[in-house]
């Protein structure tokens, strides 16, 4: 399948500089972002639920997609567009049985084997990385690099969003390595101006794609 977004904003309320997450997400929405993953792993379900409900109402207002990290139950409870899994979550095939056919399932992967496993289990798209160094992904090990992204792109037919230190300056490299889009945390959630950051990333993505489309086929 194809995705209807190429910028996937992942939340982290610890990066908002004290601003309510709602205000930061709304600023990103005003900047054109149309896909979000609510990823607040420290919150128990009872606290995550009202935040997820708030995010669902907000994203619906803008016609944007909302996926919930890991919690299939919370995703269903707030009528989210899907769930985002990790390699330690429920398998995508099991999540699909619970969610039904109409919701998205994304899976975070860090190796070719993980990417192939997620594809085999029925994921709709992959987030692969960290491609470059970023503090938020440091616990997941060293950056995998662009070569690993190329290998996964050649082996897996699903849409792939690159994550980990991805920014305007290296977008060309990431797209050239085969990414269909990008997933970002600090580049938007931690930005001084999340609206402008979203606008800038989206404009750069559109420009790069337009340039690629205008190039003659080899």
Feature-to-residue mapping (PLM):
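Short acidic/polar capping segments at secondary-structure boundaries
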Residues: 133, 166-167
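A short, flexible beta-alpha/helix-coil linker loop
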Residues: 13, 132-134
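Glycine/threonine-rich flexible loop motifs
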Residues: 136-138
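A short, mixed-charge helix-start or loop-turn motif at secondary-structure junctions
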Residues: 37-41, 134, 183
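C-terminal binding/interaction regions
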Residues: 177, 181-184
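Conserved N-terminal beta1-alpha1 strand-loop-helix module at the mouth
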Residues: 1-90, 97-124, 141-143, 147, ...
């Amino acid at each position: 399948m194809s995705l209807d977004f190429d910028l996937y904003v992942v939340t982290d309320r610890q990066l908002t500089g004290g601003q309510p997450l709602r205000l930061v997400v709304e600023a990103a929405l005003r900047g054109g972002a149309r896909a979000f993953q609510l990823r607040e792993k420290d919150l128990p379900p009872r606290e995550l639920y009202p935040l997820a409900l708030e995010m669902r109402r907000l994203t619906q207002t803008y016609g944007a997609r909302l996926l919930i990290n890991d919690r299939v139950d919370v995703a269903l409870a707030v009528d989210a567009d899907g769930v985002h899994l990790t390699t330690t979550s429920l398998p995508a095939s099991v999540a699909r049985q619970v969610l039904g056919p109409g919701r998205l399932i994304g899976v975070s992967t860090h190796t070719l084997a993980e990417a192939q496993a997620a594809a085999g289990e029925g994921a709709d798209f992959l987030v692969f990385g960290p491609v470059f160094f970023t503090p938020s992904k440091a616990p997941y090990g060293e950056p995998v690099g662009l070569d690993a992204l190329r290998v996964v792109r050649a082996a897996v037919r699903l849409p792939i969003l690159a994550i980990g230190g991805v920014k305007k300056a290296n977008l060309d490299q990431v797209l050239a390595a085969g990414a269909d889009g990008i997933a970002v945390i600090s580049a938007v959630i931690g930005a001084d101006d999340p609206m402008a950051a979203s606008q800038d990333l989206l404009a750069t993505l559109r420009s790069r794609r337009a340039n690629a489309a205008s190039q003659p086929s080899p």
